């Protein structure tokens, strides 16, 4: 939009450069035009306001109340910071869900990105049929947060599941992975890692952008495959890595579906899969403590925002933009 | 809306090619945007159907296809007798039902009549969502004269009749008859002590190669019966009816059972702890017994080809009571409250309707009609559950109070603590202490 070159003030919404003499007349038109703009925006705007912005603000208000869903709004009591206080001082299951979510994200996200990058490197060649392979590797992430996939996962990784039958071929006795509190979360991590298709596709696109002359120059300087990867590929790819890292971290923190399905919505066995969002859901809808759940949601939002800020502020130390200057 | 804009007044002589058309289009769009919600509102008003003299009662329940068909037939019957009343029925699976009910309530638009169970009755009653039916009962508009008094009492919260029992059930220990006969093992009987039950299960494990009993230490209904046999209860007023010592004893009882091989391994116990009927170990073949409700027998039977038997939980059977398997409640703010009460009265007391509904929601609450239904039924599994429940009814003890606010959390905490002990991550004493502390927090808030 900003790229429109023709300076046509009647068609641009912001026309502060116009001569003052004609302001009155154009003002009306601008008004009409602006109105038209809003009318055309309205489907999106109503959606944003009604479904996102207003409920979000309401939840901020609710986070300072003892709202329990069933009590009418008029009888809701303002409790100040009590919900936040309770979260940090006297709710062991909240802390537990924070730990579960952190360990999930800290392990699953880097491994997922590594898998995506590794496969992207393998698939970044001109083999015949490589397109089909890319498609196949991308397939799992198309199924995204699907419930069906989580159900398949549960059946693959229980005691009688396919994975244990596979292990049995090598004489290894498997575990009841999804029903073992020591392994249930790890099973979810594997599921998340397996769905590396989306970042893989982005990595592939990034790899194609790396100029071949850089590799040629490196070869001339006598760099081996590893040196080329470390000194050419990684720096050139760093903006893409950064993008994927931010996105996948946010996704990782918000994992819900698989944990919900695997544990029948309880976070079990023994809270081992009690992800933050699942805990939030149980608090709000099963325990009916919607005010407290709202406070949890806001702490979560702020935490994710902080992490993203940290990413962006450290990015300048390692993200290299190829247009000559590091931003 | 706006003063007419003269086209020639536009800057640098530019004119709109078709200003009028544009403006008209614009106005049309605006009108459409403004009017859309109005249309929606008008449609919503139409739902009340006040215009054609008919009243529409909304009704919401959880359950499967079979229940939906039976209920729809019973409601059709009501419409036949009262042509001015029609129904807007909504039903869904149990999972997610209470989320939806809570959301509907929050939106100020709950159904006139809804199905609810003892896990949530107190939550809703305490917040005045449910209509107190006492007034209708006193006026004779709601006939409860044929109800067992304890069953009726189990719908009373804080002195208000918050829900009308839609059916009665009680705890039932279901065992795999085929497996026992095949291995020449004795069938368990009502009145066996807990120790005898565990010893029996150990024997089954050894001879049949299938764990004798599911470890029910995570199951609040088994824990509850056991507590009542110790002279305690799950709740006492607004407090817990038990102590850490009681829970420790309960967990230790089952630790012993696990150690002696009477139960499956912890991961299998965990599978069986799911409330889903299809996952009960007695039908998945992973254990010889499961701890369920008697009225779940026909449903369990559908999931296995083996023959099943059902008895009371171990110990003194008088610890069991006539539990309302579920209730019908009326929304307090319903515009058609009187009619809604008449409908639930019909569902409970009309001979034809009760016959149609059968034992799908538990044994009919109306004792006269219960007899008729049990004489008529041909489904062997249903017949069996009716017989057992009728027999148990002879020894039923007094109903406990309806579980208090925070009960769903207490249930979840019991599962967590018991599984902690089962997986060996905590000793029975540690798990018990953790459970009681979590419960106190849950019911305090």
Model-inferred region functions:
Chain B
Residues 119-170, 309, 393:
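Hinge/lid segment of periplasmic solute-binding proteins
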Residues 1-58, 80, 430, 437-445:
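Short, low-complexity disordered leader/linker segments with a strong preference
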Residues 53-64, 85-90, 112-113, 162, ...:
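Short, well-ordered beta-strand elements
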Residues 80, 86, 137-138, 155-222, ...:
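Helix-loop-helix "hinge/cap" segment bordering the ligand-binding cleft or interdomain interface
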Residues 298, 330-408, 444:
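Mature extracytoplasmic/periplasmic domains
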Residues 222, 249-339:
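Extracytoplasmic/periplasmic substrate-binding proteins
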Residues 76-146, 181-184, 280-284, 289, ...:
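Extracytoplasmic "Venus flytrap"/periplasmic binding protein-like
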């Amino acid at each position: 939009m900003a790229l429109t070159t023709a300076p046509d003030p009647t068609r641009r919404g912001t026309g502060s450069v116009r001569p003052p003499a004609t302001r009155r007349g154009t003002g009306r038109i601008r008004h009409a035009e602006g109105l038209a703009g809003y009318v055309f925006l309205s489907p999106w705007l109503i959606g944003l306001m009604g479904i996102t912005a207003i409920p979000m603000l309401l939840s901020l208000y609710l986070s300072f109340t003892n709202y329990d869903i069933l009590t009418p709004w008029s009888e809701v009591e303002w409790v100040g910071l009590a919900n936040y206080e309770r979260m940090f001082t006297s709710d062991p299951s909240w802390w537990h869900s924070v730990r579960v979510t952190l360990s999930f994200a800290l392990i699953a996200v880097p491994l997922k990105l590594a898998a995506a990058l590794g496969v992207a490197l393998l698939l970044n060649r001109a083999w015949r049929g490589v397109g089909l392979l890319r498609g196949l590797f991308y397939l799992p992430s198309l199924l995204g947060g699907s419930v069906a996939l989580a159900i398949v996962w549960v059946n693959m990784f229980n005691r009688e599941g396919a994975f244990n039958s596979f292990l049995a071929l090598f004489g290894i006795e498997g575990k009841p992975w999804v029903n073992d509190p020591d392994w249930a979360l790890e099973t979810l991590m594997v599921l998340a890692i397996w769905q590396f298709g989306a970042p893989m596709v982005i990595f592939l696109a990034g790899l194609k952008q790396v100029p071949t002359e850089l590799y040629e120059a490196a070869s001339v300087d006598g760099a081996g495959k590893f040196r080329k990867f470390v000194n050419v590929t990684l720096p050139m790819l760093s903006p893409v890595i950064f993008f994927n890292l931010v996105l996948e971290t946010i996704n990782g923190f918000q994992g819900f579906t698989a944990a919900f399905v695997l544990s029948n919505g309880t976070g079990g066995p023994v809270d081992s899969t009690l992800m933050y969002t699942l805990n939030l859901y149980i608090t709000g809808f099963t325990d009916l403590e919607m005010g407290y759940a709202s406070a949890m949601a806001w702490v979560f939002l702020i935490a994710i925002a902080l992490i993203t800020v940290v990413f962006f502020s450290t990015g300048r130390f390692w993200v290299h933009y190829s247009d000559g200057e590091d931003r | 809306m706006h003063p007419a804009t003269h086209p020639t007044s536009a800057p640098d002589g530019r004119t709109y090619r078709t200003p009028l058309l544009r403006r008209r289009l614009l106005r049309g769009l605006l009108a459409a945007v403004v009017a859309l919600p109005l249309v929606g509102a008008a449609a919503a008003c139409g739902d009340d159907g006040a215009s054609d003299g008919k009243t529409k009662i909304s009704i919401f329940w959880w359950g499967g296809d079979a229940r939906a068909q039976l209920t729809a037939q019973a409601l059709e019957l009501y419409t036949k007798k009262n042509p001015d009343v029609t129904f807007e029925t909504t039903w869904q699976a149990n999972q997610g039902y209470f989320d939806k009910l809570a959301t509907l309530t929050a939106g100020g638009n709950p159904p006139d009549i809804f199905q609810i169970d003892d896990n949530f009755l107190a939550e809703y009653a305490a917040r005045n969502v449910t209509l107190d039916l006492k007034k209708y009962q006193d006026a004779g508009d709601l006939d409860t004269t044929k109800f067992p008094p304890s069953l009726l009492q189990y719908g009373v919260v804080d002195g208000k009749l918050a829900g009308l029992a839609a059916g009665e059930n009680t705890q039932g220990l279901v065992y795999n008859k085929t497996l026992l006969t095949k291995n020449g093992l004795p069938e368990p009987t009502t009145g066996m002590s807990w120790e005898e039950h565990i010893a029996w299960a150990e024997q089954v494990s050894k001879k049949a190669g299938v764990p004798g009993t599911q470890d029910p230490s995570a199951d609040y209904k088994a824990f509850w019966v056991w507590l009542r046999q110790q002279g305690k209860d799950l709740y006492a007023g607004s407090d817990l009816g038990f102590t850490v010592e009681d829970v420790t004893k309960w967990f230790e009882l089952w630790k012993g059972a696990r150690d002696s091989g009477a139960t499956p391994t912890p991961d299998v116990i965990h599978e069986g702890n799911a409330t889903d009927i299809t996952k009960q170990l007695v039908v998945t073949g992973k254990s010889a017994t499961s701890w369920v409700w008697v009225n779940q027998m026909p449903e369990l039977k559908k999931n296995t080809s083996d023959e099943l038997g059902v008895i009371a939980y171990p110990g003194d059977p008088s610890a069991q009571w006539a539990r309302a398997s579920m209730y019908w409640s009326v929304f307090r703010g319903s515009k058609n409250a009187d009619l809604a009460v008449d409908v639930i009265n019909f569902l409970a007391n009309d001979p034809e309707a009760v016959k149609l509904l059968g034992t799908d929601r538990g044994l009919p609450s109306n004792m006269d009609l219960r007899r008729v239904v049990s004489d008529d039924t041909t489904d062997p599994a249903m017949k069996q559950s009716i017989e057992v429940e009728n027999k148990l009814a002879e020894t039923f003890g007094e109903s406990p109070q309806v579980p208090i606010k925070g009960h769903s959390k207490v249930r979840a905490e019991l599962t967590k603590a018991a599984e902690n002990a089962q997986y060996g991550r905590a000793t029975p004493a540690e798990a018990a202490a953790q459970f009681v502390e979590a419960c106190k927090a849950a019911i305090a808030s």
